[in-house]
Amino acid sequence: MRSEWVARRRGQANVTQMHFARQGVITEEMDYVARRENLPPELIRSEVARGRMIIPANINHTNLEPMCIGIASRCKVNANIGASPSSSGLAEELEKLKLAIKYGADTVMDLSTGGGDLDEIRTAIIQASPVPIGTVPIYQALESVHGNVEKLSAEDILHIIEKQAQQGVDYMTIHAGILIEYLPLVRNRLTGIVSRGGGILARWMLAHHKQNPLYTHFRDIIEIFKKYDVSFSLGDALRPGCLHDASDEAQMAELKTLGQLTRMAWEHDVQVMVEGPGHVPMDQIEFNVRKQMEECDEAPFYVLGPLVTDIAAGYDHISSAIGAALAGWYGAAMLCYVTPKEHLGLPNAEDVRNGLIAYKIAAHAADIARHRPGARDRDDEMSRARYNFDWNRQFELSLDPERAREYHDETLPADIYKTAEFCSMCGPKFCPMQTKMDAEALSELERFLAKQPTA
C-alpha cells in the first residue's frame, strides 16, 4: 500500500513523519491515520510535529497499514512474540503474529533471542505484518558475539541497529538511559535490574567501567533512524521489577535522562515514545504517568502493565490489566500486554490470546474514561443487542466472538436458543430483561402516580 508514498520520498536525508509534519506536510500516512481514528488530519499532523504522537512507519515496511500512538488517539495495545533458544521457532512465531493481529494487537514486538536465524525470523514477521513491528536490537547484538557481553562493542550494536532498520523494523527499544552512575542506585532493590536489555548493558558497564555505549552513540543512532523513519522506544532499563522497587531513585534518575534523550531526538525530527514500568502499586500509577509527561514533554508513554501485585503468578495478565487500565486512563498512549505465562515461561498461542484480550479490555476502558470520540458506541450497541436478546449480534460485538459463542453454547448449543429470551444463568422464568418498560406502560404509571396524594 505504501510503496508509491515512500517512493516519492527516497533520496531525502530525513524521511521521518515528524520531519514532514514540522514542514506543515500532511503525509499519506497521516491522512490514513486520521481516517482510522476519526480525527482531523491537521490534528494528527500537529500532534506528530509536537512529539505527542508517533506514526511508527519504516519506509521499508511497505505493507504496513499506518497507525498512531499518542494521547489524542485511541489507547493502543502491543503484543510481544519471539523465539527463544529453548522454545519455539519461525513457524510458531508466524502463527503467534497471526493470532496477535486477529485479536487486535496494534503493534507487535519481535523479541526473539534464538530458535533459529534471527534475521530470517524478523524478515518473515515484517513481511507478514500489516501492523508496526518493534525490536530490541541489543538482543541480536549479544547473539552476534555468542553471548559474551565483554566482547560486545558499540560498532557491533550500531551494525545490528542499521541492519534491522534496513529490514523494515518500525520502532526499536533503545536502552540509552541507564547510565553507569545509576548502577549503585539499585543496591537496595529487592529485584535489582529486571530488563533484559538493561541487564546486558549493566554487565557491559561493570566489565569495562565505561559509559553505556547506547548513550555515548545516541547521535549515531539518530542518524540511522532519520534515514529509515525508525521511531525510538526509549527503554526503561531500570524499571521496577516488584512493588517494593517502584518509583525509586534509580527509576527516576533514568527517567530524567530519557527526557533529555527525547529532546535530543526531537532536535533531529526523529519520533520518540518512552517506555514505563513495570510493577507499580495502584496508588503510584497516576504519579508515574504524570512524572513521565513532565520529564519527557508529553512524548507518548508506553507501559508494561503495570502489575499491581506480585503474587498473581499464572494470572499476571489480570493483575497487570488492572494497572494498564488505570495507566491508560491517566494518559499512557500504549499498553504492552502481559500474558498468563509472565515470570513463568515463554507464552504459547493461547497465552497470546488471553493476554491480548485482557489488554484490549484495559485499553477500551481507558478510551471510554477519557471520552475519546466514539469509544462507547460499541458498548451501547452491545447493550441494545442484550436487551433485544440478539445473541448472534452480541457474539459479533464481543472482543473475542469465538469465546463468547463457545461459553453460550456450552449449555444451550441449539440454534433455537440464538433467539431465546434467556440464557442458562436465569433460565426462561427469571431473566429481568424480559420485563420490557415500554413508553405506554410508563406513561400510564406516571398518570397513576400523579393522582396519588403527596406525603
Curated annotation (Swiss-Prot):
One of its GO terms (cellular component) is cytosol. Its cofactor is [4Fe-4S] cluster. Pathway: Cofactor biosynthesis; thiamine diphosphate biosynthesis. Its EC number is 4.1.99.17. The gene is thiC. One of its GO terms (biological process) is thiamine biosynthetic process. Zn(2+) binds at H279, H343. InterPro entries: ThiC, ThiC/Bza_core_dom, ThiC/BzaA/B. Coiled coil: none annotated. It holds the Pfam family ThiC_Rad_SAM. This is Phosphomethylpyrimidine synthase. Substrate binds at N80, M109, Y139, H175, S195, R196, G197, D236, A237, L238, R239, E275, Y302. The keyword Calcium does not apply. Keywords: 4Fe-4S, Iron, Iron-sulfur, Lyase, Metal-binding, S-adenosyl-L-methionine, Thiamine biosynthesis, Zinc. It comes from Synechococcus sp. (strain JA-3-3Ab) (Cyanobacteria bacterium Yellowstone A-Prime). It catalyses: 5-amino-1-(5-phospho-beta-D-ribosyl)imidazole + S-adenosyl-L-methionine = 4-amino-2-methyl-5-(phosphooxymethyl)pyrimidine + CO + 5'-deoxyadenosine + formate + L-methionine + 3 H(+). [4Fe-4S] cluster binds at C423, C426, C431. PANTHER family: PHOSPHOMETHYLPYRIMIDINE SYNTHASE, CHLOROPLASTIC, THIAMINE BIOSYNTHESIS PROTEIN THIC. Catalyzes the synthesis of the hydroxymethylpyrimidine phosphate (HMP-P) moiety of thiamine from aminoimidazole ribotide (AIR) in a radical S-adenosyl-L-methionine (SAM)-dependent reaction. Binds 1 [4Fe-4S] cluster per subunit. The cluster is coordinated with 3 cysteines and an exchangeable S-adenosyl-L-methionine. Belongs to the ThiC family. One of its GO terms (molecular function) is 4 iron, 4 sulfur cluster binding.
